[in-house]
């Protein structure tokens, strides 16, 4: 199973969980049983959160941390779903192991820009969302960018670990800097067109990059945009998109109650400012 398929299953699980944990747990458990080796740390975390009772939750965490040597960001193991385990000695031991592994990962983690040299006329830079990585971004965007050779697909991976094998972005004044630096570094490499695509938190990093640095691209594609930059810098974002003459495209699920309002907000103000902007949802 491809990682993107696991992500799709987890998204479906979240939707089912809104109606009830037992149904969501059974759905995910059935999917896992079909191909156990195809699922990673995030699936085990979901199963632990959705499990019926602390014993079952602990079993999934033990399998993830003790048997598979995975780890999680400390905050996620402090979730309310694990309240019944907060004083459990076995749980605290597993959490301590996970926390130590997380600290070790943070100490040596650096941002990764996949670009090595110009290999096509056009460049597409993909920015992953939280609990993802550069490989996931490449797999998600490759079907859209295509493999005809017209576009060179590259990625930027955050320096901030989220969990075992995954990374995250922070909505602050520094997390976006690798994205900005990556865009700036290829602006004068002779590409005919440079496009950037982000998913969820990756969209916010792209907007921060073009707003707070000289970074520029011809096209910004924002998929399911979670963009808290709008809370304090909406006017700056609109001004920069207009001044730098960048085309803006939004894609979002019609039932996405978190991201669609943000997409509509930025679409409205950029459209009013005369920017080349498109919003599609389904």
Model-derived features: positions:
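Gly/Ala-rich beta-loop-alpha elbow adjacent to hydrolase catalytic centers
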Residues: 198-206
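Short beta-strand-to-loop junctions in surface cap/lid or active-site-entrance loops
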Residues: 107-121
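A conserved short beta-strand
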Residues: 215-228
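The feature captures the conserved acid-bearing segment of alpha/beta-hydrolase catalytic domains
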Residues: 227-282
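Short beta-strand immediately N-terminal to the catalytic nucleophile in serine-hydrolase-like folds
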Residues: 196-198, 223
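Alpha-helical protein-protein interaction scaffolds
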Residues: 2-97
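Active-site signature of alpha/beta-hydrolase-fold catalytic machinery across serine-
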Residues: 208-212
């Amino acid at each position: 199973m491809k990682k993107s398929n696991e992500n799709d299953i987890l998204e479906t699980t979240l939707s089912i969980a809104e109606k009830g944990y037992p149904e969501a747990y059974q759905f995910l458990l059935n999917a896992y049983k079909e191909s156990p080796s195809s699922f990673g740390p995030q699936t085990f975390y979901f199963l632990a959160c959705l499990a019926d009772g602390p014993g079952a939750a602990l079993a999934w965490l033990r399998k993830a941390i003790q048997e598979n040597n995975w780890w999680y960001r400390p905050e996620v193991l402090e979730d309310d779903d694990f309240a019944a385990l907060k004083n459990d000695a076995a749980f605290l031991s597993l959490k301590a192991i996970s926390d130590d592994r997380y600290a070790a990962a943070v100490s040596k983690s650096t941002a990764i820009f996949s670009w090595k040299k110009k290999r096509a006329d056009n460049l597409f830079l993909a920015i992953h969302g939280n609990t993802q990585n550069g490989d996931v971004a490449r797999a998600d965007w490759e079907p859209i960018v295509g493999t005809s050779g017209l576009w060179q697909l590259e990625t930027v991976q955050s320096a901030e670990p989220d969990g075992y094998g995954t990374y995250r972005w922070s909505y602050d004044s520094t997390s976006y800097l690798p994205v900005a630096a990556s865009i700036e570094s290829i602006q004068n490499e002779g590409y005919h067109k440079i496009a950037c695509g982000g998913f969820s938190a990756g969209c916010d990093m792209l907007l921060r990059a073009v707003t707070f640095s000289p970074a520029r691209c011809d096209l910004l594609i924002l998929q399911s945009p979670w963009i808290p930059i709008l809370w304090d810098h909406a006017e700056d974002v609109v001004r920069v998109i207009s001044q730098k003459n960048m085309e803006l495209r939004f894609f979002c699920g019609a039932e996405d109650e978190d991201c669609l309002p943000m997409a509509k907000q930025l679409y409205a103000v950029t459209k009013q400012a005369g920017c080349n902007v498109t919003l599609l949802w389904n």
